[in-house]
């Protein structure tokens, strides 16, 4: 899971 995109993953 990406660090900056972890919120956009879900």
Curated annotation (Swiss-Prot):
Give the record's GO CC terms.
extracellular region
Which tissues is this protein detected in according to the database? Answer: Expressed in the antennal lobe (at protein level).
Compartments reported by the entry: Secreted
Task: Provide this UniProt record's keywords sorted from A to Z.
Answer: Amidation, Neuropeptide, Secreted
Q: Give the sites modified to Arginine amide.
A: 10
Lineage runs:
Eukaryota, Metazoa, Ecdysozoa, Arthropoda, Hexapoda
Q: What is this protein called?
A: Tachykinin-related peptide 5
Q: What is its main location?
A: secreted
Which BP terms does GO give this entry?
neuropeptide signaling pathway
């Amino acid at each position: 899971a990406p660090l900056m995109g972890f919120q956009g993953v879900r």
